[in-house]
């Protein structure tokens, strides 16, 4: 669900766009630093067919919401409460806080855990 408890289908949110799927957690410092580094890239390319969707691994929605607000994430964030969908295991992220996946308009993975600079280089080529 999103932070308001609404059910959201991830594939509908990223359909036809180059997207960064950001699996993160409030307690994962490296995840949050990585996400914050993506804010300028998101702002530059969001009107050109790029989006980011965060999925927080939390015990409560409030914890994720507070962290996203504190860090200033301008994109849609969803929450997986108590590993209900086993997302981290499905994407081989295991017990860690998170990981990122850059996918193209058809959902093909372009990069796993790319830096902001790598994402920008890829977007420069794809979204001219």
Language-model segments: residues:
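Extracytoplasmic and endomembrane cell-envelope/extracellular-matrix remodeling and assembly machinery
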Residues: 1, 5, 60, 119-121
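A short beta-strand-turn-helix
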Residues: 1-19
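Active-site acidic short loop of glycosyltransferases
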Residues: 15-16, 47, 95
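Hydrophobic beta-strand anchors of alpha/beta hydrolase catalytic cores
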Residues: 20-21, 52, 100
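Hydrophobic, well-ordered secondary-structure elements that form the walls
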Residues: 21, 64, 77, 107
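Conserved redox-active cysteine motifs that mediate thiol-disulfide chemistry
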Residues: 23-40
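Thiol-based oxidoreductase modules, predominantly thioredoxin-like and allied folds used
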Residues: 48-63, 73-84
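Thiol/disulfide oxidoreductase modules built on the thioredoxin-like
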Residues: 69-73, 80-127
């Amino acid at each position: 669900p999103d932070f308001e408890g609404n059910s959201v289908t991830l594939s509908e949110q990223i359909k036809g766009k180059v997207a960064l799927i950001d699996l993160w957690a409030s307690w994962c410092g490296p995840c949050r630093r990585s996400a914050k580094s993506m804010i300028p890239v998101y702002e530059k390319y969001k009107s050109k067919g790029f989006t980011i969707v965060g999925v927080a691994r939390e015990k409560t929605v409030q914890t994720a919401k507070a962290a996203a607000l504190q860090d200033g994430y301008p994109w849609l964030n969803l929450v997986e409460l108590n590993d209900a969908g086993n997302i981290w295991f499905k994407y081989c992220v295991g017990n860690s806080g998170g990981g990122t996946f850059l996918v193209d308009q058809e959902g093909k993975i372009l990069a796993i855990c790319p830096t902001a600079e790598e994402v920008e280089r890829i977007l420069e080529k794809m979204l001219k």
